[in-house]
Amino acid sequence: MSLQGSYQHFCLWMFLGTTLALGQGQVSSRLRLAVLPEDQLQMKWREAEGSGLGFLVQVTPMAGDLEQELILTTKTPKATVGGLNPSKSYTLQIFELTDSGPILLARREFVIEDLKSQSLGRGSRRLAGATLEPTSLPLRGPDSEKTSEPSIAFTLSRDLPILDHPQFQCTPPTPADIIFLVDGSWSIGHNHFQQVKDFLASIITQFAIGPDKVQVGLTQYSGDPQTEWDLNSFQTKEQVLAAVHHLRYKGGNTFTGLALTHVLEQNLKPAAGVRPEAAKVLILVTDGKSQDDVRTAARILKDQDIDVFVVGVKNVDEAELKLLASQPLDITVHNVLDFPQLDTLAPLLSRLICQKIQGRGPVKPAAGTRVLDPLPTPTRLILTHATSSSIHLSWTPALYPPLKYLIVWQPSRGGAPKEVVVEGPVSSMELGNLTSSTEYLVSVLPVYESGVGKSLQGRATTAPLPPPGPLTLAAVTPRTLHVTWPPSAGVTQYLVQYLLATSTGEEQKREVHVGQPEVLLDGLEPGQDYDVSVQSLRGPEASEVQSIRARTSALGPPRHLTFSDVRYNSTCVSWEAQRPVRLVKVSYISSDGSHSGQTQVPGNLTSATLGPLSSSTMYTVRVTCFYLGGGSSVLTGHVTTQKAPSPGQLSVMELPGDAVKLSWLATALSGVLVYQIKWMPLGEGKAREISVPGTLGTATLPGLMKHVEYEITILAYYRDGTRSDPVSLRYTPSAASRSPPSSLALSSETPNSLQVNWTPPSGHVLHYRLNYTLASGSGPEKSISVPGTRSHAVLRDLMSATKYRVLVSAVYRAGESMAVSATYRTAACPALHPDSSLSGFDLMVAFGLVAKEYASIRGVAMEPSALGVVPTFTLFKDAQLMRRVSDIYPATLPPEHTIVFLVRLLPETPREAFALWQMMAEDFQPILGVLLDAGRKSLTYFNHDSRAALQEVTFDLQDAKKIFFGSFHKVHIAVGHSKVRLYVDCRKVAERPIGDAGSPPTGGFITLGRLAKARGPRSSSATFQLQMLQIVCSDTWADKDRCCEIPALRDGETCPAFPSACAYSSETPGPPGPQGPPGLPGRNGPPGQQGHPGPKGEPGPPGQTGPEGPGGQQGSPGTQGRAVQGPMGPPGAKGEKGDQGLSGLQGLSGQQGIPGKTGLQGPKGMRGLEGPAGLPGPPGPRGFQGLAGARGTNGERGAPGAVGPTGLPGSKGERGEKGEPQSLATIFQLVSQACESAIRTHVLKLNSFLHENARPPMPFMAETAKLGRPRSIDPGLHNEALLPGDWGHILRPEDQGEPVTISHTSNPRLQEVQTPESLE
């Protein structure tokens, strides 16, 4: 038979089986009955016009069963009743409820089996083996929602085979134990739980139940699991189905992990009916994520060789489902979008479970496995060492050690259980992270290869959280209390609460959380009592309260007035004050009342400096603190200033002629206005005196006669009029031989130093004194001392290019000689090379462009030069050579200089301008440098003038352009005061005027090859070759240079030969030749001159001791010894307890803490009681379009319309793409949808035809479906005949597409498919 013919017969068969025979009588003619799967009865009746308050459906059995009633709301003329006995007789009565009482609408007696027979008789012409059974939404009782009406859909029955296949019945060859673990939490609800029961019954129906076949057990779980019946509780299928029917809904939370542990502990015991030889299957049905850990129990179940199937509904955690289920996951994990879809999953899941059992075969214990029945259990569970967060467990192991132990614990008052698996033969462990003061129920389960033994249980209570130790006041001020306490073990933070002792309301109590066992309470009132309490916290747990009453100190006067750093004109006064102080006033007055003053300091300071004061005077000092409430009492003290300090360390140095130089050390740091110096001979003669400024420390005293003793006196006058005590010494100018050094010579080694050399005088010199200062006399004079055995010294840290005056004198025991002097200017630049007299800077060395350093510089390459020993360095575009000015120029660049470079421009040199060498400021702005522009073939020198304005000079003559022709050229740029000269290959090319240059910066950067348009520290460079780059500190070097590096300009007389030259000219001397043959003996020469003295002989024996010589002169003072710290000595004895220290200052207020993290979501609350019925809702939305009405009479024929113009032919469309081949599953699904749509259309048309005169038109049916992608079917997993309704469940959720709405028309061959976008 063709596929089209089969489809027509199949649709005809389904259409004929849609209506059951109606009973006789006018009342019964308004009632229609239909039998649904599992002996449910669906009824529909017609409403009377003006329906009353509702309907009462009463189904009364003839005998035996209880009466079941269902009250429906208005406009719901249909209902479904389940749980009926198919062989018993029932009476069905339907009443309309009105204000005057119930009115009978319909009455009928029926037997389920008779209704089935009538349906089969009327469908004798249908295809054999198929039936159509109506299915309804879940059964709704009086408590169900009343906002929606039941609707009818028609599906293929799965109780009968399709196309002559026998009905599916699983009779496995080996016994099987199937345990259902059903989620009964609040999230399921009563209505959906009924659908879960239907789902369980659909699975159980397809298995052969019996003691030697398949046994079924069931456990329902929520907050705590409960075994509804064990495996051996029922012997027949009817008993099991009856138990499913009477299964009651529990409600509660979702603790799947605890339920799995319950299965291990209770349902898999031999006493529960588990057979060792039977295959074991666990089927878990849940609709939510577990609130406890499931991994441990799931792993043990799978290790026990138990096949775990998981069925998830709605928003379940798919990752958790895969964690629970056995392998392979595509068979054992199933997820449906809603509870009504469980009915369609049952046939497929039954076949998969059957195939799994059949594939396992009989279970046999492994070789060497010891079968224990009953399984041994440990004994004597002891719970000890209970702390606030832990309990120690110990037990006596069983005689036969298990593979592992499963430890489960939870609070006895309820809460999420936790579990852990302990491997190996252990008998103790410690449970941590527990809650304090909580009783725990602990279970220990041994796990064997053959199952789980009986649990060993015990109870223990954790200790309370330890409170803080005794509170202690560490510091007290008027505004703060510093409280400390011993820390508590296992505490994360402390809660500190404090309140005025006189307060009566708790609302004034303040609290603070701290992490350390101390707290500083601030913002308190002075002189008040406070009650302070502290609690230990660990998460939500709190300990008992530890309290203390403390009192803040009252405001008072300052204390402990002390004086320090007492000088002749000032002193520092300090005090202690209580906080908070706004202002402190300090006043002082001299003892005679002639001098007084006062000062004010902020309240956060505790000291002040008083001055100016008079020397050697006693002062009375008074300190007053001012608070918010006023001033404190006065604290008084006395202090006496010191004498004005006198100059010290006087020394005299004899100068040439009749003058001497007096030197002294000023003991006062500042304040000296003038020094008064007086000298007079002790015999006859007049006294003389001079005054010098207070900033000096030396003075020249003229007119002193030889061999005359003088008394020299000096005293200091201060700015406040105070005079120091005079200081004097006696000095006699002597004519004794105190010869000064001679031949004083100065030279400049570096720009910052001077080399001083002299010829020592005759006589024993103790040391030499070197005084040096600026020749202009504007700066201070400095002095150094040189040992008498040396005749040279180096003066360092000098300014470059600056003239200095240096004086050198010899110091004898009898005094100091006259000083010899000389002046010299420090160098502006260092020597260009160590053995060169030319001064300047070699920038090749400064930038590391030498053979030993270039390899570490990016973008630089080196190659030997054919012109000589100087190598050639190539700078590429990625070379970024930059150095700080201070690293290259230790001194300032002189205004007259010459820039010398030997350069070659390459073909890849950019055509834009680049700076061969330039100086930049800190902001990378050019200040001084040389630009080469290969595009314009010009050379530009630029600098800043004295006004910091940029000035530049450009050379673009023909002789200058040859620099850009690709050969090496030596270029000199001589910069003078008013002009710049350009030399190319040691020949003057041009001269340009330029203004005076400003001083180049001592900071900034120096770069090589930087592109002129570049900005910032990172920039590109030009590509060129460089052999030489120097700056000579002279503008005349270009006229002296001979350009020996250029072969065409070499002169054999002035230029040395290249050591590495391959060929030599006739003008250049060659290397020495080989040694010639020995010559003939010569004549005897004249007598030689007297030879040099021979080497020193060996020391002779010691001589006899000579007489004692005269006493030697006093030696010079030795150098100061260096103290070396010795090893640390042993600790000394403990000293006596010191006085109590001063109170610390008030700390600053801490910053406000960041908000804590959001807490975890609490567990779902218990379902509340059902509320009263609400008010009627607003009118519903507009309904669907009704069915088409009866055809009307033909209207009059209209006038013919005008003929329109002939349209242009359209363009030929493009050929469509080849369609993808569809799988058999997709074709079958489309055929099924089309068939069902046609049947529904015909049913609606039939109903409309039968009742078109009695009721308004009904809306046509619309169903929501999802278009999916084709998916191949594994024939190895689905070897049973699949029912048509099963194809949709083989498609996974991820294979389904967007929802579409299929509207069925009156023509079964026409279907309008509308996407969600087209419906808007």
UniProtKB/Swiss-Prot annotation:
Compositional bias annotation for Polar residues: 1302-1320
Coiled-coil segments on the chain, per record: none
Region (Disordered), start-end ranges: 728-752, 1064-1220, 1291-1320
The organism's place on the tree of life at top rank: Eukaryota
Compositional bias per record (Gly residues), positions renumbered to this chain: 1106-1115
Signal peptide start and end residues: 1-25
Subcellular location: Secreted, Extracellular space
Name of this chain's protein: Collagen alpha-1(XX) chain
All residue ranges annotated as the Collagen-like domain in the record: 1069-1122, 1125-1174, 1165-1221
Gene Ontology cellular-component terms listed: collagen trimer; extracellular region
Pfam families from the UniProt entry: Collagen (PF01391), fn3 (PF00041), VWA (PF00092)
Function: Probable collagen protein.
Keywords: Collagen, Glycoprotein, Repeat, Secreted, Signal
Ranges of Pro residues composition bias in the record: 1069-1080
Annotated ranges, domain Laminin G-like: 840-1035
Comp. bias (Low complexity): 733-748, 1081-1093, 1140-1152
Domain called VWFA: residue spans: 177-352
Residues with attached carbohydrate: N433, N569, N604, N771
